[in-house]
Amino acid sequence: MAERIVVSLTSADQEYQALQGENAREAGGRLGVEVEVLFAKDNGVLQIQQLFRFVHAGEGERPAALLVHTRVPDGLERVARNAVQAGIGWILLNRTAPYVDALRRECPAIAVAAVTTDHVEIGRIHARQLARLCPDGALVLYVQGPAGASAASLRLQGLEEALRGRPYELKVVNAEWTAASAEKAIAGWLRLRTSDLFQPTVVVCQNDLMARGARAALERLRPDWARLPFLGCDGLPKGGRLDVDEGRLAATITLPSCASPAIDLAVKWMRTGGVPPALTVLAPSAYPAR
């Protein structure tokens, strides 16, 4: 197999996904390996088709490794198993999946791993930011990612654990990591009669794009709520951090890119045979740091 790595991402419209693609290419250039980045237009079926195309390629045309960020990783177990059985490394980005350990046992010489942010810690950081903003408690409008995404559920888990026994009440609304989906989700919730029973004092969003979408819906339908403090996550320099600096967000959380460390692990395996650990966890950080 050639020294080539394919990075499969879900959507170029999601800021963090775009960052992963850029960082993967930069890491490939640094290490002297070919890196091909593909986006699946937020379409799970298309992503599976793209990945199978590489798995079923001729032996000399297959990549050495596939690095995959997917909306719901459990749905890719069959692709992962076929890839690993063909000798192709498989590394999940910013999430993990139950099948990783099983594939490592079945094919111990192949790189099967996950490089992910500590999503539970993201929830804990949001809890600390909430405590500084609203020390006496709050009604929290919480915009979560897709219900089936492990990253979304772990972030909520961390927040709920950190807030347990304290005077904070959550109203969870699910969206799809994008501004448009959050705007639609919040608008739909506001049209429900039950929304009148919950008067939020703060809005917490699992990424900065959804914070923008949620704010857009509130500005249009409940302009008095649009002035509430917002918390986000991802913290890109021209995204969430800029929103904090210019006052649109009260705070955000900066996430490291998983792509560059994953490229490092894949290249080490390709060149030395050293199998990476099953799980590499990267630490998020609050922005601003105080």
Language model: regions and residue ranges:
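Hinge/cleft segment of the Venus flytrap/periplasmic-binding protein
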Residues: 3, 143, 162-166, 254-290
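Extracytoplasmic "Venus flytrap"
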Residues: 4-23, 27, 35-54, 69-74, ...
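Short, solvent-exposed amphipathic alpha-helices that sit
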Residues: 16-31, 50, 122-126, 150-168, ...
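Short beta-strand elements in bilobed, periplasmic/extracellular small-molecule ligand-binding domains
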Residues: 28-45, 139-142, 163-183, 227, ...
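Hydrophobic alpha-helical segments within soluble ligand-binding/sensing domains
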Residues: 47, 112-140, 182, 235-240, ...
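Beta-alpha junction/loop-to-helix N-cap segments that form part of ligand/metal-binding clefts
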Residues: 48-102, 208-211
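Hydrophobic alpha-helical
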Residues: 68-88, 159, 171-241
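Flexible loop/hinge segments that line or gate small-molecule binding clefts
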Residues: 79-121, 236-245
